[in-house]
Amino acid sequence: MGKYMRKAKVVVSGEVVAAAVMELAAAPLGVRTRARSLALQKRQGGEYLELRSRRLEKLPPPPPPPPRRRATAAAATADATAAESAEAEVSFGGENVLELEAMERNTRETTPCSLIRDPDTISTPGSTTRRSHSSSHCKVQTPVRHNIIPASAELEAFFAAEEQRQRQAFIDKYNFDPVNDCPLPGRFEWVKLD
């Protein structure tokens, strides 16, 4: 901020002080704002964009790269139809940018047959409702999972050993039998509350 301000020289004679004040009034105060720079640009009449203190001239867009050549006849017909569609899109006008890479693509993305569980459930857009049972479909055998719930006797036998171990650890630590709800002789003295 200091470089935009000028100090007035204080001299005994009134003439020097007045000259300094007149000089300050003639110079623009403050920073150049966007409005001031636009007004200066209109007065100067230049064909450029002014960003901060640099001038940037707008260049025309680069020409599109030439299309690639293909060896097959099918690719040549695909190029011809792509060129016709490109001409049709260009004729509408506007600033639409054509994606040449997308037009030159001649393969489709597919899901591998090993990842499809049931190929009969997948329908392609525009296909009929008739199912085609061709040998080209990959049949993946999925294992059949049955939810077998063990009997309650098996569950009791499975958890009984761990429950017994936890019960014995509690009895040893607190000298209290939680199953029978009675204190046992040991290091703690149990008192029944009212």
Swiss-Prot record:
Keywords, alphabetical: Protein kinase inhibitor
InterPro entries: CDI_dom, CDI_dom_sf, KRP
Annotated Basic and acidic residues bias: 49-58
Gene Ontology MF: a single term: cyclin-dependent protein serine/threonine kinase inhibitor activity
Induction data: Down-regulated by cytokinin.
Transit peptide recorded as keyword: no
GO biological process: regulation of cell cycle
Protein name: Cyclin-dependent kinase inhibitor 4
UniProt lineage: Eukaryota, Viridiplantae, Streptophyta, Embryophyta, Tracheophyta
Gene designation: KRP4
